[in-house]
Amino acid sequence: MVKARKEPVNAVQVFGRKKTATAVAYCKRGKGLLRVNGRPLDQIEPKVLQYKLQEPLLLLGKEKFAGVDIRIRVSGGGHVAQIYAIRQAISKALVSFYQKYVDEASRKELKDILTQYDRTLLVADPRRCEPKKFGGPGARARYQKSYR
């Protein structure tokens, strides 16, 4: 019995982050599948931010995504933070896939298009919530002071 040799899976795994939301994207050769937690992109809520999710696809064109499957797991954060994490994960996954398995010139082209439009598509936003301190209701606000 001869075992059929499986060709190695050309895949990359990257993550996108926004606040406490983390999206892990797994990108491999395929036929253009894009799924978030097992659901297609157009079923992701809220519908108002649907265009934010579509931005990498609209910027780079569907033909760039035709040869790859991207599966994304997202957790943590709120709805908006998750959407920003997903779009970052999609962009980073495609760029790193092109770097590893296609060629450096097309990777640079993709990276330039994405950063020219919006830098947060590839670079995480470092802003975090400031911790609350004593003497006030929040991080900076103080309780009202009375003299008499």
Swiss-Prot record:
Example GO biological process: translation
Top-level taxon of origin: Eukaryota
Gene3D superfamilies: 3.30.230.10
Molecular function via GO: RNA binding; structural constituent of ribosome
GO cellular component, as recorded: cytosolic small ribosomal subunit
Residue stretches spanning the membrane: none
Entry keyword set: Ribonucleoprotein, Ribosomal protein
Statement: the UniProt record of this protein carries the keyword Cell inner membrane: no
Family assignment from sequence similarity: Belongs to the universal ribosomal protein uS9 family.
Designated name of the protein: Small ribosomal subunit protein uS9
